[in-house]
Regions:
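Residue(s) in the substrate-gating loop at a strand-loop-helix junction
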Residues: 140
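Conserved glycine-rich Rossmann-like NAD(P)H-binding loop of the short-chain dehydrogenase/reductase
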Residues: 31-47
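The beta1-alpha1 cofactor-binding region of Rossmann-like NAD(H)/NADP(H)-dependent oxidoreductases
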Residues: 61-71, 103
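Active-site helix of classical SDR
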Residues: 121, 156
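SDR active-site lid
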Residues: 173-239
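Substrate-binding pocket helix/loop in short-chain dehydrogenase/reductase
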Residues: 97-98, 102-110
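Conserved glycine-rich cofactor-binding loop
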Residues: 10, 15-18
Length: 294
């Protein structure tokens, strides 16, 4: 296998403790990159770092906390060298009707997925300018078309896409490339938890056949890492998602038609309810953002 352009370069991955972030870390380690793994779950991060065949640094940091990110960046530079690739992967979700959602939980999704991505970019942009590096914003299928019962997540991922497009145009002349990743449904704890709620499971399974398929985190990560090696401006996982860009303006009427048909049926028995933070990552974020004194 030819030597990867990522070999011996320092790569930062946020949200690295589990799911797609963990899969990205393992795929990047296969390219012999030095890895800085950021997230909330210290034990999981440390275990992941210890299992990798490359230098790896596990750091607990909240992507919405500018001071924590600056401290992490200083430690990364001191122990692994200046980062030349940053993957803004940290993300959380909560589902259910907007009208009865918890305003604090709703806003937290925006803060982590959008503001946290921007704060990550702000922290490491000097390094990327110095190294003519690459920033990958992990967006989502939800960036291409919003769905009901996921208003905060869809808004945050649409915002993250727009932020990355803007940043892409701002820093290109400085030698920094910015890419946007559009993963479809990925087999993570977040998705498994969401599928336990009848309304969310049925809304997903009523999507067209290709769009409702859940893909393995390893397969998605492999595709994203190939895009990082090539400094792509966009990467779709799976590849057919690129075609959705052409028809994305037609998606809202389709979603509206399906929702008008399905939501009354789903709401006729047990009323639709908020899910709270989805998955172990969501619960870890809530615990870190609102610690309870012993």
């Amino acid at each position: 296998m030819p030597r990867s352009p990522l070999a011996d370069r320092t790569v930062v991955v946020t949200g690295a403790a589990r799911g797609l972030g963990e899969a990205l870390a393992r795929a990047l380690a296969g390219r012999r990159a030095r890895l800085a793994l950021l997230g909330h779950e210290g034990a999981a991060l440390n275990a992941l770092a210890a299992s990798l065949p490359v230098p790896a640094l596990a750091l607990e940091a909240d992507v919405t906390d500018a001071t924590a990110l600056r401290d992490a960046a200083d430690e990364i530079r001191g122990r692994l060298g200046r980062p030349s690739v940053v993957v803004a992967n940290a993300g959380i979700a909560q589902g259910g009707p907007f009208a009865t959602s918890d305003p604090v939980e709703w806003r937290r999704v925006i803060d982590v997925n959008l503001t946290g991505s921007a704060q990550t970019a702000r922290t490491f942009l000097p390094d990327l300018i110095e190294t003519a590096g690459y920033f990958l914003q992990v967006a989502s299928l939800a960036s291409l078309g919003a769905t009901p019962m996921m208003s905060a997540y869809c808004a945050s991922k649409a915002g993250a896409e727009a932020f990355a497009h803007s940043l892409q145009a701002e820093v290109a002349h400085q030698g920094v490339a910015v890419g946007i990743a559009y993963p479809a449904w990925t087999a993570t704890d977040m998705i498994r938890h969401a599928d336990q709620f009848t309304a969310m499971h049925e809304l997903r399974t009523h999507m067209p056949a290709p769009a409702r398929t859940v893909h393995s985190a390893d397969a998605v990560a492999a595709r994203l890492v190939r895009a990082v090696e090539r400094r792509r401006t966009a990467v779709y996982a799976p590849a057919w998602l690129r075609s959705v860009q052409v028809v994305r303006a037609a998606l809202p009427p389709v979603v509206l038609r399906v929702s008008r048909r399905e939501l009354p049926r789903l709401d006729s028995g047990r009323p639709l309810r908020a899910t709270g933070p989805l998955g172990a990552g969501g619960r870890a974020d809530r615990a870190a953002a609102d610690p309870v004194d012993d």
